[in-house]
């Protein structure tokens, strides 16, 4: 159920993705883009379900039980799953030492970032009783990686904006019956929802979905999947920095070490890809 004054989690997902998808689709119609191509709609719907419903839904569900640090650590394993599941690119990725070392170093950086919290995670969260939730969260991370790779290897004939809109609409529609089955509407009092909750929803629609997720889908089309996957390492860094800047939180030595380790790993992964592109450019010139 929702926290006092907030929207229930799955209803929030339904509103967020449905509204964001319809707004983005409206923009595509305004630009007179092709939107009703059956093959692309099906492909986008599959991607949307894997990314925004299964993966994102599992994160929403898990956060009701697991500590946020544990969720962040498990979600940050996504780049590793990208490499393991991207079979067409195994010959390239598994032979690229910079990419492999970068992924390992990046995950180590995330562990350093949360090192001061890791020790008490199991004790604070009930230990082995949370194992099913942890496994479920790993499944969600695998779903995100699989959905991203499905999108990458099944290119659409429509624009990234149209594809993103269909993905969000598909996920938003599926969230609705889940919210109803969980009884979220039975306990909802719209008048008791705080203004801050509505503002948070507006932020998620405009920036979290229309801006950020659209950028993610576009990047999958134009950049290697291993590069795009490093967002999972960068997100915790941004969260810590925002906490320091806007919430007045302090940053420890180990957190600072983790930040630089993560940034170094992302640089290593991207530098390897950049050098490869430069070599290819020289050969073709």
What annotation goes with each model-predicted range?
Residues 24, 45, 77, 95-117, ...:
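Hydrophobic transmembrane alpha-helices of multi-pass small-molecule transport proteins
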Residues 24, 82-84, 88-90, 121-185, ...:
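Transmembrane alpha-helical segments that form core, pore/gating elements
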Residues 5-10, 14, 36-42, 100, ...:
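Juxtamembrane helix-entry segments on the extracytoplasmic side of multipass membrane proteins
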Residues 10-13, 17, 196-199, 233-285:
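C-terminal-most transmembrane helix of multi-pass membrane proteins
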Residues 1, 19-38, 107-127, 170-196, ...:
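Membrane-interface helix-cap regions at the ends of transmembrane helices
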Residues 25-75, 111-112, 205-223:
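Specific transmembrane alpha-helical segments of multi-pass solute transporters/efflux pumps
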Residues 14-15, 52, 56, 71-77, ...:
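Helix-helix packing/entry segments at the starts of transmembrane helices
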Residues 2, 12, 16, 62, ...:
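Hydrophobic/aromatic residues within transmembrane alpha-helices
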């Amino acid at each position: 159920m929702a926290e006092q004054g907030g929207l229930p989690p799955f209803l929030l997902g339904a509103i967020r993705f449905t509204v964001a998808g319809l707004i983005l689709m409206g923009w595509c119609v305004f630009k007179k883009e092709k939107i009703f191509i059956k093959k692309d709609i099906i492909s986008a719907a599959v991607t949307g379900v894997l990314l925004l419903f299964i993966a994102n839904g599992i994160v929403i569900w898990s956060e009701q039980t697991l500590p946020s640090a544990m969720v962040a650590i498990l979600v940050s394993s996504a780049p590793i799953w990208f490499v393991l599941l991207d079979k067409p690119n195994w010959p390239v990725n598994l032979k690229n030492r910079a990419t492999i070392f970068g992924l390992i170093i990046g995950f180590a950086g995330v562990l350093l970032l949360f090192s001061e919290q890791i020790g008490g995670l199991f004790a604070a969260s009930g230990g082995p009783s949370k194992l099913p939730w942890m496994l479920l969260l790993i499944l969600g991370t695998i779903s995100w990686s699989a959905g991203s790779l499905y999108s990458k290897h099944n290119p659409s004939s429509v624009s990234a904006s149209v594809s993103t809109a269909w993905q969000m609409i598909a996920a938003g529609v599926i969230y609705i019956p889940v919210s109803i089955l969980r009884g979220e509407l039975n306990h909802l009092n719209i008048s008791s929802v705080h203004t801050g909750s509505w503002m948070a929803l507006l932020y998620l629609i405009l920036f979290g979905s229309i801006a950020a997720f659209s950028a993610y889908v576009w990047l999958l089309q134009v950049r290697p999947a291993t590069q795009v996957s490093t967002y999972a390492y960068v997100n915790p860094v941004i969260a810590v920095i925002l906490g320091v800047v806007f919430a007045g939180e302090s940053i420890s030595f180990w957190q600072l070490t983790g930040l630089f380790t993560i940034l170094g790993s992302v640089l290593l992964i991207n530098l390897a890809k950049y050098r490869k592109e430069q070599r290819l450019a020289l050969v073709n010139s």
